[in-house]
Amino acid sequence: IRLLHSLTPPPPPPPPPPPPPPPPPPPPPPPPPPPPPPPPPPPPPPPPPPPPPPPPPPRRARIHHNIPLFLRFFKKSYSSHFHWRCGQRNHCHSFVCKRLLVAYPVRHFLSAACQFLPWLSINSFSGTEMLNNRFHGLITL
């Protein structure tokens, strides 16, 4: 029996265990984030400001259109040299002076008389006249 036992082939070895299942594939990497949108283009520069308007031409002194009427107030022929002597703030009591000059503003009469009546001699006028914007100074004829 021992002999028989030794002659019998050994039992086959047990089958090897099945190989372990392969590990699951790693999850795919997440897709890369989309690139940030490009920055908006800078706003266009504001248009340059319009050039300033040219300065107005200097105004010329107007010739008062009533100068001939002004001369018509004279009833007689007087000397052609008039002097406003108001440095002493003398007030005029002359009827001719008041009648002729009370209605003429200083600025208009000066600008007109200096051009229209070149023989007119204006010495000065007082602060009182400037306040009233009229001629009330002493006229020497």
Swiss-Prot record:
Keywords: DNA-binding. GO terms for molecular function: DNA binding. Residues 98-116 bind DNA. Residues 1-61 are annotated as: Disordered. It comes from Owenia fusiformis (Polychaete worm). This is Uncharacterized proline-rich protein. The lineage of its organism: Eukaryota, Metazoa, Spiralia, Lophotrochozoa, Annelida. Residues 8-58 have a biased composition (Pro residues).
